[in-house]
Amino acid sequence: QQVAGGSFHSLALRSDGSVAAWGSDTAGQVSGTPPESGFVSVACGHSLSLAIDGSGAIASWGDNSDGQVSNTPTGTGFVQVSGGDSHSVALQSDGSLVSWGRNHHGQVSDTPAGNDFVQISAGGNHSLALRSDGTIAAWGSDTEGQVADTPSGGGFAQVAGGDYHSVALRSDGSI
């Protein structure tokens, strides 16, 4: 159904909604995998695993050195989650964002407000969010221009964050 890769581990969502995990298990990101089924999406951070169940609740397991697990938002209605180096960001069904984990570059505290977001991606220590009008919000670490060099204007269809870079796909298929 879906696969996700962290720095040294991977997840796969099976057709029955259960999660398979393999790779490095330095912080329980593999061995902590919930046994139940009912998950609809998976994501990985550096040493963190994340999954959303059918109600929109987030499950997280693995590295908790910066609150990546213990500060995971509760409740339902989450439609997407993405993990970075030591932080995560989630998109709620109302189009708003929630971030948690390490905040040494503003990747949590600078999360933009609003309810017009449609897609997210956590990079190493920064995050990106695509708005319904095709514009991009970027926040967090900017050591390599991964935030400041974010293109202005609309026309974007997807965003992705790497450790020290960001990439965006335009609606016309160009990058």
Q: Where are the model-predicted features located?
A:
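Tandem repeat domain/solenoid detector
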Residues: 1-2, 15-20, 37-41, 54-59, ...
